[in-house]
């Protein structure tokens, strides 16, 4: 039943349409033009972006995407479509659309599809468990911008984060236990979160606090020594200080400390993508083994796991139930 005419908008970061230099350039131009992502003065940043970053970075990033591209397309989009389909089946009668903050399918296209179905209450669910101004707030900005073109807008419920949701912690615990059962318990379990500039945290972003909260709850949930669970941050961009410790530096130092077997989980990524499949599963694995490590296993993202879809359903129904009461 959908008496309240609810509609769900799942949002993820985005992906290029193809693993080509031209497609990557278009995608990066949109992504890196967002002031939530790069907050430098446009007068300073645009010449850097178009004069240096896009000409030199696009071809290199295209080669990285080619390593992880599947017959169905970009893993992020493939899993996003599966999440959309499976969640719609669970919600039975409530339409679900997938939109990307950058690239396709666009937020505009997704919202338009929902409003054509007479949705009166829009539930926006960014697929970022931990809030950050550079990700979650960018979704809010994007949705608000799209709604400006409509005379009548729907009511909106924005799910800001779910870093401590019991179903989220339970789903992560399940994936960790499956990996331990398959590969044995490692010397260290490393939780790798996407990094952001330290300056963002210093000026009020709660992202680091939310990552630490998820880590603390996971430590309590799993049957594994808490002192053997580590945190680190990946994917830094540019020269300024980002959240530490950095994943790549951690990979190079652990073997010297006698740590020969590690497993890595990226709790902040709801779907596997370039940052998990290439950066962690391939590049950082190589760093660890080259530094003297012996065993490295990457624990997949929640993707289209049943426990992940159940989590998304609970997040949506939490709002629907409150509206119906």
UniProtKB/Swiss-Prot annotation:
Fe cation binds at residues 194, 275. Keywords: Cytoplasm, Heme biosynthesis, Iron, Lyase, Metal-binding, Porphyrin biosynthesis. It comes from the Bacteria. The keyword Thylakoid does not apply. It holds the Pfam family Ferrochelatase. GO terms for biological process: heme biosynthetic process. It catalyses: heme b + 2 H(+) = protoporphyrin IX + Fe(2+). Gene3D superfamilies: 3.40.50.1400. It is found in: Cytoplasm. The keyword Cytoplasm applies. One of its GO terms (cellular component) is cytoplasm. PANTHER family: FERROCHELATASE, FERROCHELATASE, MITOCHONDRIAL. Catalyzes the ferrous insertion into protoporphyrin IX. Belongs to the ferrochelatase family. This is Ferrochelatase. It comes from Photorhabdus laumondii subsp. laumondii (strain DSM 15139 / CIP 105565 / TT01). The gene is hemH.
């Amino acid at each position: 039943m959908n008496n309240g005419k609810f509609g769900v908008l799942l949002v993820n970061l985005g992906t290029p349409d193809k693993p080509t230099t031209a497609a990557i350039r278009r995608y990066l131009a949109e992504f890196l033009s967002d002031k939530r992502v790069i907050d430098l003065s446009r007068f300073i940043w645009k010449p850097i972006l178009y004069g240096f970053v896009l000409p030199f970075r696009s071809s290199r990033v295209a080669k990285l995407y080619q390593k992880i591209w599947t017959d169905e397309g970009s893993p992020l989009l493939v899993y996003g479509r599966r999440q959309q389909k499976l969640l719609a089946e669970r919600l039975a009668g409530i339409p679900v659309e997938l939109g990307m903050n950058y690239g396709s399918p666009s937020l505009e296209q997704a919202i338009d599809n929902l409003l054509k179905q007479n949705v009166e209450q829009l539930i926006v669910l960014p697929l970022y468990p931990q809030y950050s101004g550079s990700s979650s707030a960018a979704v809010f900005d994007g949705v608000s911008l799209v709604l400006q073109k409509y005379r009548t807008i729907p009511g909106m419920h924005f799910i800001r984060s779910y870093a401590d949701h019991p179903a989220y912690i339970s789903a992560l615990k399940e994936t960790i236990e499956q990996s331990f059962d398959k590969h044995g318990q490692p010397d260290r379990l490393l939780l790798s979160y996407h990094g952001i500039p330290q300056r963002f945290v210093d000026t009020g972003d709660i992202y680091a606090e939310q990552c630490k909260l998820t880590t603390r709850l996971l430590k309590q949930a799993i049957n594994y020594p808490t002192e053997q669970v580590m945190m680190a941050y990946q994917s830094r961009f540019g020269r300024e200080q980002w959240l530490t410790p950095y994943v790549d530096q951690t990979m190079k130092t652990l073997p010297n400390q006698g740590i020969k077997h590690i497993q890595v989980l990226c709790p902040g990524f709801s779907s596997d993508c370039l940052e998990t499949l290439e950066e962690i599963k391939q590049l950082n694995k190589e760093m660890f083994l080259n530094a003297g490590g012996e065993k490295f296993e990457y624990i997949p993202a929640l993707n289209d796991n049943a426990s992940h879809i159940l989590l998304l359903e609970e997040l949506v129904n939490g709002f629907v139930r409150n509206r119906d009461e």
